[in-house]
A protein has these predicted regions:
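Residues that flank catalytic or metal-binding motifs in active/ligand-binding sites
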Residues: 8, 87, 190
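Well-ordered alpha-helical scaffold segments within catalytic/enzyme domains
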Residues: 11-25, 75-79, 90-108, 137-152, ...
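Hydrophobic alpha-helical segments of membrane proteins, primarily the transmembrane helices
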Residues: 4-8, 83, 183
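Extended ligand-binding groove/face enriched in aromatic
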Residues: 2, 27-135, 174-176
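N-terminal carbohydrate-binding/catalytic regions of secreted carbohydrate-active enzymes
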Residues: 1-29, 34-37
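Catalytic domains of carbohydrate-active enzymes that cleave complex glycans
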Residues: 1, 22, 35, 117-219
Length: 219
């Protein structure tokens, strides 16, 4: 497996959401559902809500560190430690697009949508990379507000927005170094983050805030 699976799978979920909206392809919808289930497994398999797995693979029987055996429902899998800021971006991007496509209105995916809501709230409440003030916290609280319509999450997201908006309005200032070499990893992560925030601003605006204008300026 790719050691950056969480990030790339989130981007793939978004691509299949876009594809489905344009074409109505059943294959795109099936791809999205299968892939977002993988993202949620990253959250669930570790047994510790403060962390998440970086990637998964089929069980080998005796995994060396940093791989660990799954248990219970996930006994057929192994997971790799190291879920971090970069991988978090992919998880959030994928969950946001899956909820927007499948869960805003009845689509016959009630069980999957309940699982999405559970994982999103666990991220907002417990995941270590989403607790300190910063854009990860903004993403977690805003997505939780969107999927649950819970006012407490909305208040926390709005408060965090006021802190992060000046930074977001300036864009990703690390994409070019002084010698002119682009930071392609940083560019991609910034793009994923701005796309996710733009989706949230469209689907669940923060009260009294024109987040879209700030994000467009940053982009």
């Amino acid at each position: 497996p790719s050691h950056d699976s969480a990030l790339w799978t989130g981007a793939y979920v978004a691509s299949q959401a876009y594809r489905y909206r344009v074409t109505g392809s059943p294959e795109a919808k099936a791809n999205l559902i299968r892939s977002v289930q993988g993202l949620m497994t990253l959250m669930e398999i570790t047994g510790d809500r403060r962390t998440f797995a970086r990637t998964l693979r089929a069980a080998t029987g005796n995994p060396p560190s940093p791989w660990y055996p799954g248990t219970g429902l996930y006994a057929a899998l192994e997971w790799k430690e190291g879920g971090n800021n970069d991988m978090f971006k992919g998880v959030m991007f994928g969950l946001a697009h899956a909820h927007a496509l499948l869960c805003e209105y009845p689509t016959g995916n009630d069980q999957l949508c309940a699982r999405i809501r559970f994982n999103v709230t666990q991220i907002a409440d417990n995941l270590s990379v989403a607790q300190p003030s910063g854009q990860n916290r903004l993403a977690a609280q805003w997505l939780a507000a969107y999927v649950t319509r819970n006012f407490s999450y909305l208040l926390r997201a709005t408060a965090e927005w006021t802190v992060q908006a000046p930074i977001l309005s300036q864009g990703n200032v690390t994409v070019v170094y002084q010698d002119g070499v682009a930071d392609w990893s940083g560019t991609h992560l910034a793009f994923v983050e701005y796309m996710m925030f733009s989706l949230l601003a469209e689907r669940y605006p923060l009260p009294g805030i024109d987040a879209g204008s700030t994000l467009r300026h940053g982009i």
